[in-house]
A protein has these predicted regions:
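Conserved alpha/beta enzyme-core scaffold
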Residues: 1-105
Length: 105
């Protein structure tokens, strides 16, 4: 999962040496397109919705919207489905990349 903001998107550039990554995230952004086109993200090892990018919504440029429109790799679901701990737990080796705006200890 990739969160909103500069830090999560900056992390994407450091994933270029990885392979067979999958995406299960509320939000899909432009930064992930390059990883898909490079074959880094192919969703082949996902244990929940294998072969599919699962997301609730997109935020980005015209390139992003054109890319996902009609693309069979994408499966858009309601946010409560994508964010359900029961569904997330079905993905083996799930990693979330987010930032915190505020932490109250």
């Amino acid at each position: 999962q990739i969160g909103i903001g500069a830090i999560p998107n900056a992390v994407l550039q450091y994933l270029t040496d990885k392979k067979d990554l999958g995406v299960h995230s509320e939000m899909f952004t432009d930064g992930l397109i390059d990883l898909i086109e490079a074959g880094i993200v192919n969703n082949s090892r996902k244990t929940f919705h294998p072969g599919k990018v699962v997301a609730s919504f997109c935020i980005g440029t015209r390139r992003l919207y054109d890319y996902v429109d009609g693309n069979p790799m994408f499966e858009f679901r309601p946010t409560d489905y994508v964010s359900s701990p029961l569904n997330i737990a079905q993905n083996s080796k799930m990693v979330a990349i987010n930032t915190a705006l505020e932490v109250d200890l």
